[in-house]
Amino acid sequence: MSNQPNRIIIFDTTLRDGEQSPGATLNGDEKLTVARALARLGVDVIEAGFPYASPGDFEAVQQIAKVVGVEGGPSICGLARATKADIAKAAEALKPAAKPRIHTFLATSDIHLAYKLKKTRQEVLEIVPEMVAYAKSFVDDVEFSPEDAGRSDPEFLYQVLERAIAAGATTVNIPDTVGYLTPSEFGQLIRGIKENVPNIDQAIISVHGHNDLGLAVANFLEAVKNGARQLECTINGIGERAGNAALEELVMALHVRRQYYNPFLGRPVDSTEPLTNINTKEIYKTSRLVSNLTGMAVQPNKAIVGANAFAHESGIHQDGVLKNKLTYEIMDAESIGLTNNQIVLGKLSGRHAFSTRLKELGFELSETDLNKAFLRFKEVADKKKEITDWDLEAIVNDEIQQAPEVFRLELVQVSCGDQARPTATVILRGPEGQELMDAAIGTGPVDAVYKAINRVVNVPNQLIEFSVKSVTAGIDAMGEVTIRLKYENRIFSGHAANTDIIVASARAYISALNRLYAAIEQEKAEKEKAAVTSAS
């Protein structure tokens, strides 16, 4: 990787910064699934996590480094504070990767120095080169971030960056940590760094930003014009508070407006060479995967991947699009992998046809998972005459991409009507395989189901979000249910799809409860381990 590439490096931090969204916590297997999808998408760098943060994060980074960080694959990055313990832990987790990167950071704004770090500027100027050099002793590829660079004194920032590069940093990342800057300010910040850091040509300038004012993508594009060559982003823009810059928006902006951005990368205006390595046809699929696994629904009017991104309500617009798509569409839906809602299978379709179509859609399933998905497909096909690609996607997401089952739904029955009190009966299979049954009355059928499940499971929680949407059109369409539960200060999400919305609601609730229960059990195990360690 040259220090000044003539293309844009895409650094995906969905598994690190994106996972910090409330309720977006993923287990190790889910993180690996996302990492594989990011590799297929073509991202250059995957920030897999923060190895020092927890044993679970360490194991996830290590597994991703081993399975996804192979020769010819993406660089695998681990985050570390500017301490030797953090950096050593990151290096250990990244050992299996063919192209490991350690990303270390230290705040440089006066407010962070005074209130968080309680350090002087001189101390920071000494710590940064020492820690970058320490990281360099483990890996060749080191990234340094001056946290809250957007609110740092520019002259001090230049000194910090110069010392970081001199100590071996190959990438210097400029974060707008609180999403405060405007595009012109961000562009000036990058230009100032290009002009005032003497050794800046020895490192790639990266940018990282949050969307608190809705300006993250605009800021990044302005940064590209002023010399930034790496963009740190997340799928669907997920992340803390208002989120991060959205990968799909950045990539498609650079793709659609290539002629505009070509000169800023030293290319002829009419160059047709892509500005990124991203396979854009994988964008929609990856967006759906992340949405399903995190339980964070994509808003319908979200640019690029929202349900309405290629929909036209106005009669004038519809007429124009039918005559020529370019009248009201600046990109083709197929360019992001959004295929027509084509009918492909039915109840007479066999396992081979089912398996073949899933492979065409990009799903690589093990024999066990394929069998599970096929049984579910047959179940849906008996109730739904025509099975579309979107139905197949929903089936795979619902059947395979779920939290490990501690509780399993065996039966749900409801009785309701305008003259009857909604009543639900549920039968679950518990952690030891025991049958658990109960019934409850609610204000509606879903409320009754959830109350019955709560009586059986007995895990305290608060339902804070419940949403339903149709997968496809038609009266027999599958419905997708996404819910979010709150337990103490943590949020857990669940997702399920079914032609029966009550069944989908029950399965989504069980999915979220399984995540919650697993987290409680893990906390118990860690406390017991800590108690044993302290006793010995």
Curated annotation (Swiss-Prot):
It holds the Pfam family HCS_D2. Residues 8-269 form the Pyruvate carboxyltransferase domain. Its EC number is 2.3.3.13. Transmembrane segments: none annotated. The keyword Metal-binding applies. InterPro entries: 2-IPM_HCS-like, 2-isopropylmalate_synth_dimer, AIPM/Hcit_synth_CS, Aldolase_TIM, LeuA/HCS_post-cat, LeuA_allosteric_dom_sf, LeuA_bact_synth, PYR_CT. It comes from the Bacteria. The keyword Cytoplasm applies. Its cofactor is Mn(2+). Mn(2+) binds at D17, H208, H210, N244. One of its GO terms (cellular component) is cytoplasm. Its main location: cytoplasm. Pathway: Amino-acid biosynthesis; L-leucine biosynthesis; L-leucine from 3-methyl-2-oxobutanoate: step 1/4. Keywords: Amino-acid biosynthesis, Branched-chain amino acid biosynthesis, Cytoplasm, Leucine biosynthesis, Manganese, Metal-binding, Transferase. It is found in: Cytoplasm. One of its GO terms (molecular function) is manganese ion binding. GO terms for biological process: L-leucine biosynthetic process. It catalyses: 3-methyl-2-oxobutanoate + acetyl-CoA + H2O = (2S)-2-isopropylmalate + CoA + H(+). It is an enzyme of class 2 (transferase). Residues 408-536 are annotated as: Regulatory domain. HAMAP family: LeuA_type1. Catalyzes the condensation of the acetyl group of acetyl-CoA with 3-methyl-2-oxobutanoate (2-ketoisovalerate) to form 3-carboxy-3-hydroxy-4-methylpentanoate (2-isopropylmalate). Belongs to the alpha-IPM synthase/homocitrate synthase family. LeuA type 1 subfamily. Homodimer. This is 2-isopropylmalate synthase. It comes from Gloeothece citriformis (strain PCC 7424) (Cyanothece sp. (strain PCC 7424)). The gene is leuA.
